[in-house]
A protein has these predicted regions:
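Solvent-exposed soluble domains appended to multi-pass membrane proteins
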Residues: 1-175
Length: 175
């Protein structure tokens, strides 16, 4: 059933793009999945030929990778092989659309340049270097400071609404 749904999704995406392809209004479509299908531990152990706890950092990262694409009906430089955490996809989209970035998105933009993948599993640098969970000491001082700034602001954004820096997470409501 999963593969037949993939085929149906492909058809729907094709229809969506064909609909917007020739419009005069600039249009951007962002498509991604937030997780791989839940195929069960047995499936992954057969796939890797080992117990899940014995996987390399790279193999653990692979389990969490999901493809995405950004399509526009106007000229946009084509990029392939972009690897980033889904929490940074909104910032990349805003950059490509030419939107002004909030303070929080500017922090995300710096993170995109330094640690484009930052998850509970670990980190990936732009050059592809992986740092697994528990190896935060492998981060440079600059990377660690940037990631700590991000974690603090993410916490503030989610749990401390009364202490939000004015206009940092979105348009200033006073303006």
């Amino acid at each position: 059933q999963y593969f037949s749904l993939l085929r149906e999704s492909d058809k729907a995406i094709q229809a969506l793009i064909e609909h917007y392809q020739d419009l005069d209004e600039r249009t951007m479509i962002v498509f991604f999945g937030d997780h791989q299908p839940p195929l069960g531990n047995d499936f992954y152990e057969k796939l890797y030929g080992k117990k899940l706890d014995d996987r390399t950092t790279e193999e653990v990262f692979q389990q969490y990778e999901v493809p995405f694409f950004i399509w526009t009906n106007y000229d946009q430089p084509e990029r392939e092989g972009v690897v980033l955490s889904s929490n940074l996809l909104g910032t990349l989209t805003a950059q490509l659309a030419g939107f002004p970035l909030t303070g929080y998105q500017q922090l995300h933009s710096r993170l995109l340049d330094v640690l484009p993948v930052n998850t509970t599993v670990g980190f990936r640098r732009p050059d592809g270097t992986l740092l697994g969970e528990g190896e935060e000491s492998g981060l440079t001082e600059t990377e660690e400071q940037l990631y700590n700034d991000y974690r603090l602001m993410a916490y503030n954004h989610l749990f401390d609404e009364k202490a939000h820096p004015e206009g940092y997470f979105g348009p200033d409501p006073e303006k």
